[in-house]
Regions:
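Short juxta-domain linker segments that transition from a proline/glycine-rich
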Residues: 1-291
Length: 291
């Protein structure tokens, strides 16, 4: 049984939007926990990583935290193909729901009756894949970092997200340790590799000292001129990642006879007829998270 939802401080400024999000989250997480119990899947419960929360007293500490977390989770230095899937395997529930345009995502905790908390990252279903992945990593930062009051928590989480998605040594290997110029084509090739925006890549290169402020300003001047900093944003968008674990557990329980068709449809938030059609079809189109 869930008792409520705790959003991180100042995460949502609108009380109405917070109440709507909380109601949606409670409904979905209740069903999520129910299907986990039915199929006996306790392995996806959240266990805080070793050494966390990582103390951040300066922004470079956020970089080190990302490196240590990748090591703890045995990620190596390779890009993460599907961050949504990876986080769900670690016990973080990922939901995609509609939000206002000024909000990409937020992290909260759903409280169980026994006092334990389920971490939930909510992503605005309207955003593109590169913004989604960066937002997921940013909100993961809020979950695992302990940021000193003397520095900006949002900037620290941004630095963490950049380092988590674009490990230092890999980016240096691809781009070089010092550049006096970089082409737009290069940036878009790197975008395909890491699944992040060219703007995030440019900031990351600046943070690592690959190039300085003048090149960064020149790049952002070009981004502005091309209209890439406003909708529909830059070319070659990354496809959004959809949370799939909940659906898989429901179809698994149905196949194993652990739930009836009507119960599976209820959990998925669809009609029995729709369920019967989906069971026989490949998962070839994006399906929204049930509301």
């Amino acid at each position: 049984c869930l008792e409520g939802v705790e959003f991180r401080k100042k995460a949502i400024t609108s009380h109405k939007e917070e109440a709507t999000a909380a109601a949606t989250i409670l409904g979905v997480i209740e069903r999520y926990l129910e299907i986990e119990e039915i199929v006996g899947a306790p392995s996806a419960s959240w266990t805080p990583p070793a050494e966390s929360p990582f103390v951040v007293r300066e922004y470079s500490d956020a970089e080190h935290a990302a490196t240590r977390l990748r090591g703890t989770w045995n990620l190596g230095n390779e890009p993460i193909p599907n961050l949504t899937e990876f986080l769900e395997e670690r016990g973080v529930k990922v939901l995609r729901i509609p939000f206002s345009d000024n909000m990409d995502g937020v992290m909260c905790k759903a409280r169980k009756g026994n006092g334990t908390a389920v971490p939930v990252i909510i992503i605005n279903e309207k955003i593109n894949g590169e913004r989604q992945r960066f937002t997921l990593a940013h909100e993961l930062g809020h979950l695992v970092l302990d940021v000193d009051k003397c520095i900006d928590e949002e900037k620290a989480s941004h630095r963490f997200a950049s380092a988590f998605l674009m490990p230092r040594e890999v980016l240096l290997s691809e781009v070089g340790r010092h550049r006096t110029s970089i082409s737009i084509r290069e940036l878009f090739q790197i975008k395909k590799m890491f699944g992040v925006s060219v703007q995030a890549i440019a900031y990351r290169c600046k943070d690592l000292g690959i190039f300085g402020d003048s090149i960064l300003r020149g790049l952002f001047k070009h981004f502005n001129e091309q209209g890439w900093r406003r909708p529909p944003y830059e070319p070659m968008p990354i496809d959004p990642e959809s949370p799939r674990r909940f659906d898989r557990l429901c179809y698994r329980a149905l196949s194993e006879g652990q739930v009836s068709e009507s119960k599976a449809a209820e959990l998925l938030g669809i009609s029995v007829r729709n369920l019967s059609e989906r069971v026989l079809q490949p998962e070839d189109r994006e399906e929204p998270t049930p509301a």
